[in-house]
Amino acid sequence: MGRRLLPVVLSTLMLVSGCTSASYDLLETASVAKPRFQDTDPQDFGVNNPHRHDIHGIDVSKWNGDVDWQQVRKSGVSFVFIKATEGSDRIDPKFNDHWRLAAKADILHAPYHFYYFCSTADAQADWFIQNVPKEAVTLPPVLDVEWNPSSPTCKTRPAPMVVRAEMQRFLDRLEKHYGKRPIIYTSVDFHRDNLVGQFKDYHFWVRSVAAHPTKIYEDRRWAFWQYTATGVVPGVTGPTDINVFSGSEKNWKSWVTTASK
């Protein structure tokens, strides 16, 4: 996405993601198919229930195995984030199957990269670009940044200034190659340690499974909210991460049109 277009899109998302449950109903919406999802361990979000949102999506990796994407589409899924790469030497073995079949089912999709702080930003950007063709990027690519304490090879936690510098280099490389400004995915602790008040001109996809993001992420406007890791989605075997877009269907169509250029 061109830098000149970003302020327009961000102003729209700042409006919709800052809405209360009362003002959300005032947004202009169109009729959409009601999602047919369940959750094996649902969280009570009160009036901020994610099901109040119009646009729902999932994220997948090799751990989800084979997916019936036609059934996923019929269940009410509008978008999918698909794991592509990790570090500077790993590709998700299901990536190509997932994005090609999601595309065939007319589901908008974006690849994501799981960042390791044990190799350089350039090495990881090179690896992502080498393995992710431009046709696999219908929505902006995603940089997934979170601490990884269970990793057998990389538990490194650089200082915040180092983290942000590496992120910026990686983001710049991807934006230059794909022509779309990447989305940033993050977790509560990583955001607290490194990202509060930073990267305000990027769209954020946030993990918040215990409370609404406005209660967890300090001063952060979000575009996507991952609200559960225990979802049940027709067409996907086993627990599934489910997400919502912050605005209405009209906002979604506008965002996709702009972000996909």
Where are the language model's segments positioned?
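C-terminal motif of bacterial Sec signal peptides marking the signal peptidase cleavage site
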Residues: 15-18
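Extracellular/periplasmic catalytic domains that process cell-envelope and extracellular macromolecules
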Residues: 49-52, 73-76, 104, 134-137, ...
